[in-house]
Amino acid sequence: MDQLQQSLLEAPIIEKDGYHYFVHPISDGVPMLEPNLLREIVIKIIRKAQLENVDKIVTPAAMGIHISTAVSLMTDIPLVVIRKREYGLDGETPLFQQTGYSENQMYINDVDEGDSVLVLDDVLSTGGTLSAICSALEDIGADIVDVVAVIKKVGGENELESSPYSAKTLINVDVEDGEVVIIDSNGDN
């Protein structure tokens, strides 16, 4: 069993407002993220993602940053972080992100018309974040080469499914009876 799968099976579950969350180093920063787990995930992303001709890796703050930084270092592809803070810089594009549990305004800089991008995130659950990002990138005129999320939490409505985009994932899980259940250890292609 690989480290990602094992770490998810051992993840604590919390409930907040009727929504069951697994607490995991990739999605939450706790417990501590072991380098071997991060390395395994980065290697899997590099093997699964379409990286040819990608100009930029685009990721939302905050929990996509550590994964995307490591992928950027391994591939020499520059990293763009979509932030929750507006700076008012030239070319800044706002987007509205709505998930099953939060709503935020986010801001994209340094992505231009014609850029070929890989969208990378930690978890695909409701699809609200990735759907909003893909829509904003499309409005900018960027070419979305691929979308990858490390973990897919199945069992709920996924906004990305009703968009023209789909996400590759490394592993698909659900939370049943207070435990993480592995639905597909290879994720979606």
UniProtKB/Swiss-Prot annotation:
Q: Which UniProt keywords apply?
A: Purine salvage, Transferase
- GO BP, sorted A to Z: purine ribonucleoside salvage
The record, for Gene3D superfamilies, names:
3.40.50.2020
For this protein, the record's PROSITE patterns field holds:
PUR_PYR_PR_TRANSFER
Reported EC number(s) for this entry are: 2.4.2.-
Q: Which domain of life is it from?
A: Archaea
Provide the top EC class: transferase
One of the record's GO molecular function terms = transferase activity
**Cited function:** May catalyze a purine salvage reaction, the substrate is unknown.
Q: Which NCBIfam families match?
A: HPT_Archaea (NF040646), PRK02304.1-4 (NF002635)
The family line of this record is:
Belongs to the purine/pyrimidine phosphoribosyltransferase family. Archaeal HPRT subfamily.
Designated name of the protein: HGPRTase-like protein
Organism (species): Natronomonas pharaonis (strain ATCC 35678 / DSM 2160 / CIP 103997 / JCM 8858 / NBRC 14720 / NCIMB 2260 / Gabara)
